[in-house]
Amino acid sequence: MAAKEKVAKETPLMKQYNEIKRKYPDACLLFRVGDFYETFGEDAIRASKILGITLTKRGAGSDTETALAGFPHHSINTYLPKLVKAGLRVAICDQLEDPKMTKTIVKRGVTELVTPGVSLNDEVLQSKTNNFLASVCFANKNIGISFLDVSTGEFLTAQGNAEYIDKLLQNFNPSEVLVPKNCKSEFKDAFGEDFHSFYLEDWIYKEDYALETLTKHFQTNSLKGFGVEELKEGIISAGAILYYLSETQHNRVQHITAIQRIAEDAYVWMDRFTIRNLELYHSYNPNAVTLLDVIDKTLSPMGGRLLKRWLALPLKDTNKIKGRHAVVSYLKSNPEILHNIQYQIKQISDLERLISKIAAGKVSPREIVYLKESLDAIIPIKTLALESPQEAVKVIGDSLHSCDLLREKIKTTLNQDAPVAISKGNAIATGVNEELDELRAISTSGKEFLEGIERRESERTGISSLKISFNNVFGYYIEVRNTHKDKVPEEWIRKQTLVNAERYITEELKEYETKILGAEEKIHKIESELFEQLVNWIATYIKPVQMNAYLVAQLDCLCSFTQMAVENQYVCPEIDDTFELDIKNGRHPVIEKQLPVGTPYIANDVFLDREKQQIIMITGPNMSGKSAILRQTALIVLLAQMGSFVPADSVRMGIVDKIFTRVGASDNISMGESTFMVEMNETASILNNISDRSLVLLDEIGRGTSTYDGISIAWAIAEFLHEHPSKAKTLFATHYHELNEMTESLPRIQNYNVAVKELKDTVLFVRKLVKGGSAHSFGIHVAKMAGMPQLVISKAQKLLKKLEKNHSSDALNGIKSANDEMQMSFFNLDDPLLEEIKEEILSLDINAITPVEALMKLNEIKRMLVKK
């Protein structure tokens, strides 16, 4: 009963608010009231904390008392980004009619739902970073995933196992992920809780619905033209994204012109561990420099975003890689052309996001002027590219669209100094619309206009004292003294008689009066209509502008590679069809930029092949530079296959299809996993996925457990890699100098060490990779350099001598004898039964088999052995 009374006492405004809020229960509702956006209840409490605005009460002391917090409507671009960045979905509820035109409560409705993954607001977006919305679809064997950046129109889809989808999520780093409600736990188990997720009804994730949604949007009969028709789960996830756009009131999305397949076999495989370990975009230390920080010399937002994509997806196609290298070589040899292209790229605004705003109808007059200026800057780039003898550059020049009609239309329609909002006025140029020009003349030069009429009528009638005036009763009128009454023309209409004069009105004055009183309102209306027409007309150029944006981004990335090569003395890598990796004087691209001025980076050679030196076993103490050598090898390969030059004297290499790293400590305590467990998970992932063109980098395997356990595990892993048919190229860094013994029985393992000079009381890290193993770890020396108390150092030295005396290499001999006895290699079996078991095991799909099926298979293998 009390609840009913409360409802009855709701004000009309709060009743309207509650009706709208019920439609958007999970969003923060910004409710337009007059000149303010207000929030109520729980929304107000959250908003006041996030925005730092005053929390007050509406209807204080009454039954309808509720929390209230608000801000001026013109501050929306200041406060909205803060709410979205805090992870909130924000529903913007505007007044849908002029309050002056209604006697009842103003009609209101949600005009836009802004979420972390769906926004066109410049303050929410980062210029050189895509703002992806992702959607995942779970099936029995595959997981589908799609990514959309509504601010640029990029729409991508893929499908695969959980590991592949995890890699894509790490690479694309979406701001928001859509998940079916019945798959909450599956998503959390597979990909963790780091993503901002939103759960959709399960019926949305149906193939028929997705196909209908996508074909309707693209206005096609099928999706064959996009090359995605076989990606069933990918298509379903993409359909959910388009559904979500319509739900968030983003219905004007004609800038989403295509959906592109992420071709797994076209790019180098890097799992999440590798992406993290190599510090491509993020570092363990928030203040540290990443590879992206070093290589990003792009000058446009589009170029910056594309460079991130190239870094995430290095190429495997030799011809495409060599094509990029050829452009960099050409630009490096022609510095003047490089400088001229870069100068023009600097003049180009964010074409992708500008044209997306035009499609959505959320663009300002000034932004359209920026669009025109950007297209102007493309003309000299096109000319330079067409004159180039380099074929790939010439193709870019040929493909760039000059957009002559579009540029001319904007030039003649808008003022060069157009305002940031159409409501500010003076956006449309003079000469576009006759009525607009006349209204402006009336509005800005009314006095001159009236003086002109006064002068003309005085000359026409011969009444020299004729005067035009204004009052609130008659409006504008002509006053004539009685001495000149006989000269008044017949068409003048008398309105008032005074003692010494008569007042008249004319049709012309009445028209002028009507015009001037409504001029400002009409000017705004005409300008808005003309601007809307212009925006709709420009929208027909979406595809050529998007193509221009992509081509400029490509050129920008290649110029960035060239700039980097010039500044840092990078060389062009030689790509061939061998399985070799031959680096002469390679350098770490990030570390060399962090060294003090004048300090040279110690360069190192690395050679790997499948015949003589498949595995390099690198020993040396901590701090000696082992990890840096591992990382720089991976980064050189990565840069080469991105199409960049590389930090070395020379590099010759066959294509690498997968890069695996297990580098440095990376506890996942939040997931309840220790260092050792994380290490074993990462290493297992590597061993289960290697190929004949893989590059494997292992650092300090086994250090998270006891010494003997660690040595045993490291030994077994190294032998597995050596004996595996793929013979994957491997760098294996360890401080277990016992592993140097492996070269005696495994011919493709070669020992190297990072040179250290032992001085009187300290060690000098030379950081040079030299052939041969290292017999000492120098751990106590490192502890001393770190400032450990002398008492601790002395005690450690005594204990070390005692341990070295008491513990010979018995443990190592035990490992070697076990090796001889058990034939640790599982790939050299002569027994037909064991060969059969080997085939059984190798044919198993670990990712697809259930625990019960695994036990049944194990029981089957046991029966085979018992029979024997």
Swiss-Prot record:
Protein name listed in UniProt: DNA mismatch repair protein MutS
PANTHER family per record: DNA MISMATCH REPAIR PROTEIN MSH1, MITOCHONDRIAL (PTHR11361:SF34), DNA MISMATCH REPAIR PROTEIN MUTS FAMILY MEMBER (PTHR11361)
Family indicated by similarity: Belongs to the DNA mismatch repair MutS family.
Residue sites binding ATP per the record: G620, P621, N622, M623, S624, G625, K626, S627
Family annotation (PROSITE patterns): DNA_MISMATCH_REPAIR_2
UniProt cross-references to InterPro entries, sorted A to Z: DNA_mismatch_repair_MutS (IPR005748), DNA_mismatch_repair_MutS-lik_N (IPR007695), DNA_mismatch_repair_MutS/MSH (IPR017261), DNA_mismatch_repair_MutS_C (IPR000432), DNA_mismatch_repair_MutS_clamp (IPR007861), DNA_mismatch_repair_MutS_core (IPR007696), DNA_mismatch_repair_MutS_N (IPR016151), DNA_mismatch_repair_MutS_sf (IPR036187)
Function: This protein is involved in the repair of mismatches in DNA. It is possible that it carries out the mismatch recognition step. This protein has a weak ATPase activity.
Sample GO molecular function, one term: mismatched DNA binding
One Pfam family here: MutS_IV
Keywords: ATP-binding, DNA damage, DNA repair, DNA-binding, Nucleotide-binding
GO cellular component: cytosol
GO BP field: mismatch repair
